[in-house]
Structures are given as structure tokens and as C-alpha cells.
Amino acid sequence: FFSRLYGVPDPEERASELIDRMGLGVSQHQLTRGYSSGMKQRLKIARALLHEPQLVLLDEPYAGLDQHGCRLLTVLLKRLRTEGRTVLLITHNLREGLEVSARVVVMNHGQIVHCAPREEIEVDSFDKLYFRLVEN
């Protein structure tokens, strides 16, 4: 359905590629109501990427994923970055964000309190910033 909606050329091949990338190949013929919450989350991400958007907005995509799902998502996000796609990742987990991001923006109550390229960020000082924001 979504491939027709987006006009995806060769939709079966594209869907199969994303299903494999997200580690859902074994269960692709299973009804989604039998999927775990992590599998459903990975399926939603695959569906969002079906039409190869240039901008991808992901709000807490690691939520509900097991360690394997997190690893698959991290690999996928890094690949999207190397393909030149823009990914806006919203997360409360600094380490996840740092691993896949080129630039990190920290917001507090709708205001930007820190913005820097990933290479300039020291995790320890960032952890201190996070706890200072949480306390306030």
C-alpha cells in the first residue's frame, strides 16, 4: 500500500531490502499483530524509509528496541548519513545520538542550549550538562 502511495519503483524489491536491513526477513510473512513491540518499531522505521526520503525525522527510534534492533538501527542511520540523507534524530540518550550524528543540538524548554559538531563534544561534559538541565 505505502509503496503505491509514494510511487516507489520496484516496490517489492525495495520492501524486501528494508525488511532485511531491519532484521525482519524471518518474520516477513507473519501477521504484524504477532510482532513484538521492537519488531513493530523496526517495521515503522522501514516503512518511513520506503520512498527514500532526503529528510528523515525519527522521534525516539531506539525506544522499545532490544540490543539487536538498536545495532541494526545504528548501522542503518550511519548508512543514511553516508548516502547524504538528513536525519533529525530526537533522543534522550546522548550516546545513541553521538554514535550516529554529525551534529548535536541540545534543547531545554524549546531553547537551544548547545549546538556543536559531534567531534567537538566531550561525553563527560555533556553528561554534566544533561544532569544540570534535568535538575533545573
Model-derived features: where do they sit?
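Catalytic Walker B motif of ABC-type/P-loop ATPase nucleotide-binding domains
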Residues: V56-D59
